[in-house]
């Protein structure tokens, strides 16, 4: 029977070392569910595994995207489940490691289909942000959806 092993917790508590040591003992690969470690340009403050750690055991979803690429939890969930199915053809175990618990939950329980945001909308909002700043966007959100604004942690 195939098994997923999850190692989760906050940044810099030793998840990487523990997961590598365990993966070497049980001969398996590691899938990261740390949403900040996906991006090549985000090495500082994310505790991304060092090169000498990455060569010890095969890692997936580590610095595989650019911050300029659109990548959301729905895409991650689809990619991770596909990879898990492939890895289970050759491995009895897979280690999931990270601190982005919503991303872990998306693997285990699935996630509602997140609709794609048209690139024109993303571009328009980024332009508004560049030209008018975050305070303007917060005010706009409060006007358009006061209930969500009150529930969110953005103010």
Question: Can you name each region flagged by the protein language model?
Answer:
Residues 1-155:
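Phosphate/pyrophosphate-binding catalytic cores of soluble transferases and nucleic-acid-acting enzymes
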């Amino acid at each position: 029977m195939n098994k997923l092993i999850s190692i989760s917790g906050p940044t810099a508590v030793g998840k990487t070392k523990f997961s590598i040591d365990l993966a070497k003992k049980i001969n398996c690969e590691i899938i990261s569910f740390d949403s900040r470690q996906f991006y090549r340009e985000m090495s500082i403050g994310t505790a991304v595994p060092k090169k000498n750690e990455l060569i010890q055991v095969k890692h997936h979803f580590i610095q595989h995207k650019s911050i300029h690429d659109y990548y959301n939890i729905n895409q991650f969930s689809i990619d991770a489940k596909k990879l898990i199915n492939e890895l289970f053809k050759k491995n009895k175990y897979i280690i999931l490691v990270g601190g982005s618990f919503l991303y872990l939950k998306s693997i285990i329980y699935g996630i509602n289909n997140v609709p794609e945001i048209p690139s024109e909308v993303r571009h328009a909002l980024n332009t508004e942000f560049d030209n008018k700043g975050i305070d303007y966007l917060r005010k706009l959100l409060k006007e358009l959806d006061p209930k969500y604004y009150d529930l969110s942690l953005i103010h």
